Amino acid sequence: YEMNTRLVGSERCIRDSYNPMPNATAFPNHIENGYKGMLVVRSEIKSVCSHHHQPVSGVAYIGIIAAEQLIGLSKYTRIAQWCARRGTLQEELNNVIADEIQKATGSSNVGVYLQATHGCCENRGIGAHSSLTQTTVLRGAFTEDMGTKKEFMDNIKLQQEFAPR
C-alpha cells in the first residue's frame, strides 16, 4: 500500500501541470519612460522525462527584452515551474517556456537557456552521474543581434558564478 501511495504521489508531478497556468498579471511598461533593457531571471525547475519517466532537475535562465507589458519577477519562475511539471523532453520544455513568456509579456524578444541533470542518464544505462544537458531557444533580437545574445549569455555566466550553492 505504501509503495502505491508513493507512486501516485510521484505521478502528480506530471498531472499537476494540466491545472490552469498561474495568473501572470501584466503591467503597462510605458515605453517612453519605462524599462527598455534586458531582464534575466534564474529559476530552479524539476520535471519528469516523458521518455523514461525519470526525474529531471535543473535551472532555467529566462531572458526578455521588455516590451509594452511587464510581469512580476516571481511570475517568470512560476511559469517555468508550471511548464516543467508536465512530463516533457528538455528540448520541448525550452520552447514551451518561451511560448508562455511571450504570451504573458507580449515580447517577441525572448531567450530560454536550460541546464539540467537527467535521471535517465544517472539511473539507467550508462550511469553518468556528472552528466549535464544544456539547451537554448532564442527568439527575436536574441537571434538577430549578436550583442543581445552575448549580453544574455554573459548574464547567465554571472548568475552561475554568484548563484547560491
What function would you assign to each model-found segment?
Residues G119-C120, A128:
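C-terminal binding/interaction regions
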Residues S10, Q115-G119:
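A glycine-rich phosphate-binding loop feature that marks nucleotide/adenosyl-phosphate handling sites
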Residues Q81-Q115:
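Well-ordered alpha/beta subsegment
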Residues S131-R165:
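C-terminal helix-cap and adjacent tail motif
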Residues Y1-I14:
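Single conserved hydrophobic/aromatic residue that forms the stacking wall/gate
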Residues N19-Q81, S131-T136:
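Active-site-adjacent structural patch at catalytic or cofactor/ligand-binding sites
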Residues G9, H53, I101:
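Conserved RecA-like P-loop NTPase ATPase core
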